[in-house]
């Protein structure tokens, strides 16, 4: 059924199709037409949390937490929403989302378009979802990079009571200078500030909410080693590898190869796996890794687990394969 739907959706503007698909999914969910499936197919522990299975939804699909219940019916072991910022912002000008079907890729330069953390919290409070929910946090575009920690701290404080875990997004290529936060001193200062705030919030709320950090695929081994050292030193709870790539050389002479933004899907597969493997080598099992990037079929998820990931996340693969990808991944991981 999805291949037919995809042909129709791919005839639409990519961003319009994105919203149409989510609205349609929500309608089908409200009508009770999504079959109830047991997602407890391969329980795993991640950052102290019990997941029913290790296949999660990556951040970016549901930026405001408007579709949590419907997405929760698709069999995921966990769902991550966002990226969310302290204040609402429109993101970058349209068009800002492009499909590259010849390469099973997607280019986006969305720019953290979202309705703000307060709206997201209200959406979560209305949700009936009782599974593992991650909230991915970022900084507003107007916030100077030297004040970025302030934005992350605001989001952390507001999200804390409503999240199963929180992801610190410092790797989107679509917010100016954001990736500079992945470097040594800047990374240490930011993560230490967040870990200190986490300790305070754990005391206030009487519960511990794990903190993960999401990194880019465009890192050399020295940078990966540096990041591994920092996350171990500050005792982060997890790390997500990886975000989208700014390297579009894999697209060759394709007309969209010159578009600004991050490239995801099949073209990021090898880069993401390279970072995952190097990261796993340098982490030494001190904290779990969530593998994301280029999972287009079930066996791709199994590859990431073999390379050192504890769990995986999908997004672009869903656009090309539909919800069947989740079952395909679970089947591959069960072998």
Curated annotation (Swiss-Prot):
Matching SUPFAM superfamilies = FMN-linked oxidoreductases (SSF51395)
Binding residues annotated for substrate, in chain numbering: 63, 108-112, 169, 174, 243-244
Name the residues annotated as catalytic in the UniProt entry.
172
User: What Enzyme Commission number(s) apply to this enzyme?
Assistant: 1.3.5.2
Q: Give any single GO term for biological process.
A: 'de novo' UMP biosynthetic process
Which membrane topology term applies here? Peripheral membrane protein
Cofactor binding note: Binds 1 FMN per subunit.
**Subcellular compartments:** Cell membrane
Q: Which residues bind FMN?
A: 59-63, 83, 136, 169, 214, 242, 265, 294, 315-316
* Pathway terms, separated by semicolons: Pyrimidine metabolism; UMP biosynthesis via de novo pathway; orotate from (S)-dihydroorotate (quinone route): step 1/1
Protein purpose: Catalyzes the conversion of dihydroorotate to orotate with quinone as electron acceptor.
Name of the protein this chain belongs to = Dihydroorotate dehydrogenase (quinone)
